[in-house]
Amino acid sequence: MVLMIVSGRSGSGKSVALRALEDMGFYCVDNLPVVLLPDLARTLADRQISAAVSIDVRNIPESPEIFEQAMNNLPGAFSPQLLFLDADRNTLIRRYSDTRRLHPLSSKNLSLESAIDKESDLLEPLRSRADLIVDTSEMSVHELAEMLRTRLLGKRERELTMVFESFGFKHGIPIDADYVFDVRFLPNPHWDPKLRPMTGLDKPVAAFLDRHTEVHNFIYQTRSYLELWLPMLETNNRSYLTVAIGCTGGKHRSVYIAEQLADYFRSRGKNVQSRHRTLEKRKT
């Protein structure tokens, strides 16, 4: 397991790096005192979870010996790595001017420029022992996150999770949906008294819908549309793609089609989840 320690000058992108690491499955803690690193590692060791911790100028130890002692007390299951983010002085000044945030070392008697220089001196012991130093001066937020994924995972894309969810329009459109498809125009099993109490997960309902060409056409055209744009979506710094399929009540057509799409992309090796809002409400 990896214990990734993220440090660097304020404004260099530590928060961005921590979010990217969290997306990669790391358990992330912001600004944890160095002396607590061994305790955190021991807590996570039994759970087999890699961790990432940010350390800034406000919680660096008073002496390098304290940091070394904390590293020596880590459980053997963890491999510590120190990532140090930096940027040139003018870039840091510009970023602070753009965000209008206060530098951690700023005070009435210390200008932003002086605070940046002082911070650089205080962080030099960490910088000197870093396993990886990244200059973010010319990087965007997305480029930094992508670079970290490439270095740590060995591939350019992180795995996108495709979520197919069914819903009923009478209950409202899901607010987390990236795409919404309306299937209320398709043949409705609701009007068959035998099928009405069933759901799109039941075989008789599936057989009913499977008999209609327009259902097959809709599924084919929808999955073709998603396949066309999926490569770009996978490289667009997102963790989830939520596709919502809606019918009137969210019980028959939308459930069946959401499952069909989920099964198709799952068979193509994609990371897929499916959920059915109306059916979940009925269980509670």
Curated annotation (Swiss-Prot):
Gene Ontology MF terms: ATP binding; GTP binding; RNA binding
Which UniProt keywords are listed? Answer: ATP-binding, GTP-binding, Nucleotide-binding, RNA-binding
Q: Which residues bind ATP?
A: 8-15
- In Pfam terms, one family for this protein is RapZ-like_N
> Per its UniProt record, what InterPro entries does this chain match?
P-loop_NTPase, RapZ-like, RapZ-like_N, RapZ_C
UniProt keyword Calcium present = no
Which residues are involved in binding GTP? 56-59
- Segments of this protein annotated with the region RNA-binding: 266-284
- Classify the source by domain of life: Bacteria
Chain's role: Modulates the synthesis of GlmS, by affecting the processing and stability of the regulatory small RNA GlmZ. When glucosamine-6-phosphate (GlcN6P) concentrations are high in the cell, RapZ binds GlmZ and targets it to cleavage by RNase E. Consequently, GlmZ is inactivated and unable to activate GlmS synthesis. Under low GlcN6P concentrations, RapZ is sequestered and inactivated by an other regulatory small RNA, GlmY, preventing GlmZ degradation and leading to synthesis of GlmS.
* NCBIfam families named in the record: PRK05416.1
Tell me the subunit arrangement: Homotrimer.
Which family would the database say this protein is a member of? Belongs to the RapZ-like family. RapZ subfamily.
Q: What's the protein name? A: RNase adapter protein RapZ
Species in which this protein is naturally found: Salmonella typhi
**What phylogenetic lineage does the species belong to?**
Bacteria, Pseudomonadati, Pseudomonadota, Gammaproteobacteria, Enterobacterales
Gene giving rise to this polypeptide: rapZ
